[in-house]
Every structure is written in structure tokens, then in C-alpha cells.
Amino acid sequence: GMAGHAGTMAMSLRQDALTAAAEMVLAIERIGVAGGDRDGLVATVGLLRTWPGVANVVPGDVTFTIDVRAGTNTTRDRTVDVFLAALKEIAERRGVEIEIIPRENLDPSPCDPHLMTLMETAVQDVTGEPARVLVSGAGHDAMIMSRLAPMAMLFIRCEKGISHNPAEAVLPADVGKAVTALTRFVRLFADDYSKTQGRHSA
């Protein structure tokens, strides 16, 4: 955009980088919501900086981050393309320049289907209810471990779904069920492994 004095630059002449960025952030939210949680799609603007960053100057430069995650590369990449088209359209309409710098491009790390089946069975055996399968967009050690061996994860529900926040809370009873389910999973895995080894050696 173009920085200028807040008291002397007419509204009709402004190339306000912050208002352009604000519209872009809202477009990112709108497009993300329209994705309807498809494949665990989420989009976040977690950092926004303005320059010169003073009360009486129209912002001339804004930097912000976009974190886009999904359970598949296809969903993520298609959504990124839609984001980029929207951001470029907003920039052109508002008369500001835009520079997009990709930082990271990490592939999803899907859980092993067979281990997931064993985990679902373990959870159902312990709770009497079907396991809820979800896409976790967070980075876990399992992402690295999946390069070495098949993996699956077990999550404990948090009050109101809050995580990475001091308000995150789990109930002791849920922790107990999770430990029991994990123990059951290990037993199912051991039995399954023994049967598999028996077939290979026969």
C-alpha cells in the first residue's frame, strides 16, 4: 500500500494496506468455512504485522501468515489456489501490491488403516460406543514416526474441544478410559501380530 498521514490523506485516495489485509483475512475465513470441514480443512491467519505501526499513519505495509491444513494434499492445494485468486483480486481492486512467499509444504501423515481398525475396536470394547474418527491438523511426533513405521493415534476429548490453551481440560474418567483403551489396543495388536507371524511361518 501507501503510507500517509492519517489526518491529511483523503479516504478516497488511500491505498491502505491494513484494510486490504483485513478483507483478505475475511476472505480466507469465508473460503475456509465454505470448505465445510472437507478432509479436515482448516485455515488460520495467526500473525499480522503493520508498518509503520503508529496510530496516526495509514499503514503502508502489512505482513500476515496463512496456515492451511487438510487431510489430503488435493484438498489443501485446491483451497490454496482459491485463496491466492481471492487475495490477488482484492489486491488489484484496492490498488495494493501483494507478494506471496511459501514457507512450508508438509504432506499429511495418514494413520495406518489396519492400526486404526484395531484402535477403533479397542475404543468400542472399552466404551461400548463406536470410536469417533477425526482428522488431526496438528503436528505430532506421529508425523515423523510414520516415516519409520505404521502409526495410529488415540485422542482424549477436551472440554469444549479447547486445546493449546491454558483452559484445556480433560476429565480423569476420560484419561482412565483412554489408558484402558490403549492397553486393549496393545493386546489386540499383539494377537494380530502373532496371527500374522503364524501365517508367514506356516
Identify the meaning behind each predicted range.
Residues 1-73:
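Midchain, well-structured core segments that form catalytic/ion-binding scaffolds
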Residues 8, 30-45, 90-101, 127-135, ...:
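Flexible, glycine/charged-enriched surface loops at secondary-structure junctions
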Residues 44-53, 64-72, 97-116, 143:
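A short beta-alpha structural unit
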Residues 73-79:
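Short, conserved charged micro-motifs
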Residues 79-88:
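Short amphipathic alpha-helices in soluble, non-transmembrane regions
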Residues 108, 118, 134-136:
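A carboxyl-terminal module marker
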Residues 130-181:
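Zn-dependent metallopeptidase/amidohydrolase metal-coordination segment
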